[in-house]
Regions:
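Conserved catalytic alpha/beta core of Sir2/sirtuin-type deacylases, generalized to analogous enzyme cores
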Residues: 1-147
Length: 147
């Protein structure tokens, strides 16, 4: 994809606990990629501020929400991975895609949008379900080229 938005952050990154502004937007320049290294109490930045996972916890604002909305209104394909599609505001984002945009949901459990016509639900875990979604997209692309 040309635009992948990690709506709830990334577990391979950390940021200082004080990195949010009053507008609930984090300072991207203070985000640090740590790969799969552990982070714990005492892991601090150069100012002595404790690092925390670069993810959105329950009750926190979703800083990438407006970015996601801007991209979704022009999306050709949407792939949603590993979510119950119950918690708002993220649960409603798929509704902002164009009418002809296929929405793939990769999650082993049922979701509230399974019966929607544009939704293709791949009931599988992310590690294998995303690969299945890609294969389905490749086949669909071949069909469209042969028309």
């Amino acid at each position: 994809s040309s635009k992948v938005i990690h709506l709830h952050g990334e577990l391979t990154k950390v940021r200082p606990e004080d990195s949010y502004t009053e507008a609930d937007v984090y300072d991207e320049s203070r985000v640090k990629d740590i790969g799969y290294s552990a982070i714990g109490i005492g892991n601090v930045d150069e100012r002595g501020v404790q690092y925390r996972p670069h993810i959105v916890f329950f009750g926190e604002a979703v800083p990438k929400l407006s970015d996601a909305l801007r991209e979704l209104v022009e999306a050709d394909i949407m792939i949603i991975v590993g979510t119950s599609l119950v918690v708002q505001p993220a649960a409603s984002l798929w509704q902002f895609t164009p009418v002809d945009c296929p929405v793939y949901v990769v999650d082993p459990e049922d979701t509230p949008i399974d019966r929607e016509e544009s939704v293709i639900h791949i009931k599988d875990k992310a590690t294998t379900g995303v690969a299945r979604a890609i294969e389905m997209l490749k086949k669909e692309n071949i069909k469209q080229k042969n028309r």
